[in-house]
Structures are given as C-alpha cells and as structure tokens.
C-alpha cells in the first residue's frame, strides 16, 4: 500500500490545467470505496486476532462473511475504475491514480485472504494448551492492524510522510515476528505432545508476516 502511495507522489493535479468536473467525483468515489474496503479489512483482521486470543470459534462465520464483503468490494473497485478509464480517458497523472487504486484494492483483498487463513488455522488447531500463551503472536497481530490503519490514513490524506512512517514500523514488526517464531520453535521442542498446535501457530505467524509485506 505504502509503495503505491509513494509511487504516486508526483501525481498531484495541476488545478490550473484541470477543470473540476464529474470526473473528480469519480476519483473521489474510488477513494471512498477503498477506505470502506480498508475498514472492512481492519475489522476482519481484528476478529482473526481476537480468535487467536480467545479461541472463540463462534467468530468464524463473521470472519468468513466479512471476507465475502471484502472480495465484493475489490471487484466493485476494479470494475468502477476500469469503467472510469474507459469513459474518461484520463491524463497521465489521473491515469496513475486510478491504476494505483486498483493495485491497492487488490493488495487489501490479499491481506483479507491472510486473515481468513489465520481463522482457518485456529479452527484446525482445535485444542489450545492452557499452560501456553500466544501473547507474542497476539502482539504481532495488533502491530499489523496498527500498520494497516496507518497505511490507510496515509492513503486517505495522500501523505508521503505518513507512508514513510509505516515503513519504519515494518522493521519493528519484523523483529517481533522473529521473536514469535523462535518462541514457538522452542515450545515445539519442549512439548511434542502439542506439536500440531504450535505448528499452526507458526503458520499463523507467517500469515501475519505476509500481511505486513503487502502493507
């Protein structure tokens, strides 16, 4: 997301050369759709992380329903953006803005897939060892949610500065992922009776890392 925003840094419209028309409304509508999709994704990711902490499988249907809404939102953004390109035949700067919007929507959809994968892995884990905590994974998930929120704010405000701050947070989350991975490897070696559970936790940590890469 942040790479798309930084890449469009030079796409600032020259108002002296561009008359405000319904086309501006199209651009604003696409932006609104992306923000709404981002809010859905934040909700889904939060629910997936809560599932890790609470292991309340009653949340599963909600997560899957949100995934459907996210997929539908991505399709709507892609189709509306494509139609706008066809109708308006935008100039270079606006053309890049629309292409960036399509890329961001696709990225958000992929992050949503990771959130659903996390929920599925929790479901597969079935039994949670009561004497072990998943605080490191939970903290990693919270950090990913925070980064996602910051990236969406950067997009909403068209702020290159905020997008660079997201990049700085990446390094901190990478360290947390490494810590989380090492902790669960140690637990796996110490308690091979629950190796299936810890294996799922390692996969979940990987899903969170992949989400971070997309952000």
Predicted regions and their residues:
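Single conserved hydrophobic/aromatic residue that forms the stacking wall/gate
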Residues: 1-12, 214
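Leu/Val/Ala/Ile-rich N-terminal alpha-helices, chiefly Sec-type signal peptides and the beginnings
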Residues: 15-68, 77
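Generic structural signal for well-ordered, non-transmembrane alpha-helical segments
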Residues: 35, 39-42, 64, 68-75, ...
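Long, non-coiled-coil amphipathic alpha-helical linker/lever segments
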Residues: 45-48, 52, 144-155
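Hydrophobic/aromatic-rich structural module bridging two neighboring secondary-structure elements via a short loop
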Residues: 80-105
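Long amphipathic all-alpha helical oligomerization modules
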Residues: 84, 89, 162-211
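A cross-kingdom feature marking solvent-exposed beta-strand/loop segments within repeated
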Residues: 87-94, 127-137, 189-196
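A structural feature that tracks compact, well-ordered secondary-structure segments
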Residues: 103-124, 151-154, 163-167, 174-177, ...
